[in-house]
Amino acid sequence: GVGSFIHKVVSAIKNVA
């Protein structure tokens, strides 16, 4: 769902940051 997509994006950003 949308929540899963957002969580994936946030996870990627946190991984890079």
Swiss-Prot record:
<comment type="function">
    <text>Shows a medium antibacterial activity against L.mesenteriodes.</text>
</comment>
<keyword id="KW-0044">Antibiotic</keyword>
<dbReference type="InterPro" id="IPR012527">
    <property type="entry name" value="Antimicrobial_8"/>
</dbReference>
<keyword id="KW-0027">Amidation</keyword>
<dbReference type="GO" id="GO:0042742">
    <property type="term" value="P:defense response to bacterium"/>
</dbReference>
<dbReference type="GO" id="GO:0005576">
    <property type="term" value="C:extracellular region"/>
</dbReference>
<feature type="modified residue" description="Alanine amide">
    <location>
        <position position="17"/>
    </location>
</feature>
<keyword id="KW-0878">Amphibian defense peptide</keyword>
<keyword id="KW-0929">Antimicrobial</keyword>
<dbReference type="Pfam" id="PF08103">
    <property type="entry name" value="Antimicrobial_8"/>
</dbReference>
<protein>
    <recommendedName>
        <fullName>Uperin-4.1</fullName>
    </recommendedName>
</protein>
<keyword id="KW-0964">Secreted</keyword>
